[in-house]
Amino acid sequence: ATAHYYMTVMYLIKAARMVGNEFDVRYYSSLAYDIMVAFNKRFLDSNTAQYGTGSQASNALPIFLQMIQSTGDKGDYTPDASLTAKVLTNLIKDVESHGNRLTTGDVGNRYLIQTLARNGQHELIYKMFNHEEAPGYGFQLKFGATTLTEQWDPRQGSSWNHFMMGQIDEWFFNSLIGIRPSTTLSASVNEKDEPMQGYQKFVIAPKLVGDLKYVKSTYETLYGTILVDWTRQNGTFTLNVSVPVNTTAIVYLPGEKELKEVQSGTYKFVAAE
């Protein structure tokens, strides 16, 4: 609850900046800092780099919100990079110790998945869900589910039509497909950055994981439909993209540092894996 309180206040700061209300910016900035300090004082064990009970949700949430800080001047929200790395290591170890399975519930699922994604742990996410055991989507499919079920094990008699386990969709679009709004008018591929509103300029940076050979999807924007279609075959990566009119795409091919900036149209890119 305290972490979500902090997140809400950070949104109020953003809203105040958007409308030019400097008084509210100062007021809520001070409040957010006090919340962050109180949160770390109450829940962080700096000796072990664990939050609360050390569960996946307990450690993922403060990493996601970038509120891990041991010291700092009032109004400074810069996370402690060293301490954050240690908490992330504990989080990864916990996932691995459970056989690459999650222990989070509905509230914590998104924070776990996105914390791992934003820190480059795409292979681990793939392992977490590419199986037919509970907890996992494959287990639901195994028992004939055509919509998300309320429980990971649909045999428990709960609802067979629940959206609350759908947080994986964000990883599908932002990472596997790789479509994200650009964070600035210049190129950016940092998944931790705050995105700009709209898709007049966007990033296509697909992540290749495991034995996944084919991904195709469309994304509807105010400017039109973005299409991404990629395949892996015999060591060759092929990417087809469709960029809507009056938009610009910044394309990153796996393994290549040089970006490709393209205007509206249809394009094909080929690269070695």
Question: Can you annotate each of these PLM segments?
Answer:
Residues 4-160, 266, 270:
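Catalytic cores of carbohydrate-active enzymes
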Residues 123-273:
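Non-catalytic C-terminal accessory modules of carbohydrate-active enzymes
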